[in-house]
């Protein structure tokens, strides 16, 4: 699948997911290449159809994009609930376990998600896998002592790599932390790994989102299809 085909599937999933946002709602808006298409469609509906809703974003990038369309964006602490959060995912399996954080927004994404009545992910078909872990697992760590955390990860066989930008500088999250990517290839026991990571001093959050999502809208060549989590 080339990039143009992949983008077409992402766009189709984003447009389908935008239908979930209705007048008067408080909607969580995620981060990433697929969410960009979602926000474009919500912006179009706001400007052309008069859709009025309030957004809570998981990154400053998404906030800037939404506000460029005139969409009202507020801080998460200024709302008492979020009706639905729509976000992307880097991988998702049949048990609705996912990896997120390829865009370095995993902490804000998880905070918004855990305060939402409904969580929806939008992905293209390449993101649906049998076993998660092929995509490097992002872990957000504070800069102080980050090298020590990386050594611990190396000792556990997690194959950590500090994420750098195109200039060779450390990638910084919106909270000014570092991102360490774990090249695990496959994750057979995600719950155990999640507990190990979050109990490591210096780790702020990890990109494992386990059985959190309610629906996954998959961009498919035959049209968007919906995976529904029966355990939620």
Curated annotation (Swiss-Prot):
Any Pfam family the entry gives: Rib_5-P_isom_A
Catalysed reactions listed for this entry: aldehydo-D-ribose 5-phosphate = D-ribulose 5-phosphate
Q: In which pathway does it act?
A: Carbohydrate degradation; pentose phosphate pathway; D-ribose 5-phosphate from D-ribulose 5-phosphate (non-oxidative stage): step 1/1
Q: Mind telling me which InterPro entries this protein's record contains?
A: NagB/RpiA_transferase-like (IPR037171), Ribose5P_isomerase_typA_subgr (IPR020672), Ribose5P_isomerase_type_A (IPR004788)
Q: Which UniProt keywords apply?
A: Isomerase
Write down any Gene Ontology CC term: cytosol
The first-level EC class reads: isomerase
Q: Name one GO molecular function term.
A: ribose-5-phosphate isomerase activity
Family recorded in the similarity comment: Belongs to the ribose 5-phosphate isomerase family.
- Please name the HAMAP family in this protein's record: Rib_5P_isom_A (MF_00170)
Q: Which PANTHER family match?
A: RIBOSE-5-PHOSPHATE ISOMERASE
Query: What name does the UniProt record give this protein?
Result: Ribose-5-phosphate isomerase A
Give the species this sequence originates from: Bifidobacterium longum (strain NCC 2705)
Gene from which this protein is expressed = rpiA
């Amino acid at each position: 699948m080339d990039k143009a085909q992949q983008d077409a599937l992402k766009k189709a999933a984003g447009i389908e997911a935008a239908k979930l946002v209705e007048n008067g709602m408080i909607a969580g808006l995620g981060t990433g290449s697929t969410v960009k298409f979602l926000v474009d469609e919500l912006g179009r509906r706001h400007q052309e159809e008069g859709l009025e809703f309030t957004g809570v974003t998981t990154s400053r990038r998404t906030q800037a994009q939404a506000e460029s369309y005139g969409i009202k964006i507020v801080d998460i602490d200024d709302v008492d609930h979020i009706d639905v959060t729509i976000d992307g995912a880097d991988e998702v399996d049949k048990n609705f376990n996912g990896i997120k954080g390829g865009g370095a927004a995993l902490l804000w994404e998880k905070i918004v998600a855990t305060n939402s009545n409904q969580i929806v992910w939008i992905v293209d078909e390449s993101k649906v896998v049998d076993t998660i872990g092929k995509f490097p697992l992002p872990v957000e760590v504070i800069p102080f002592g980050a090298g020590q955390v990386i050594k611990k990860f190396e000792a556990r066989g997690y194959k950590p790599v500090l994420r750098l930008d195109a200039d060779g500088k450390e990638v910084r999250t919106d909270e000014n932390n570092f991102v360490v990517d774990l090249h695990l290839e496959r994750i057979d026991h995600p719950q155990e790994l999640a507990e190990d990571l979050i109990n490591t001093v210096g780790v702020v959050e990890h990109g494992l989102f386990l059985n959190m999502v309610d629906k996954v809208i998959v961009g498919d060549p035959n049209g968007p299809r919906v995976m529904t989590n029966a355990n939620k």
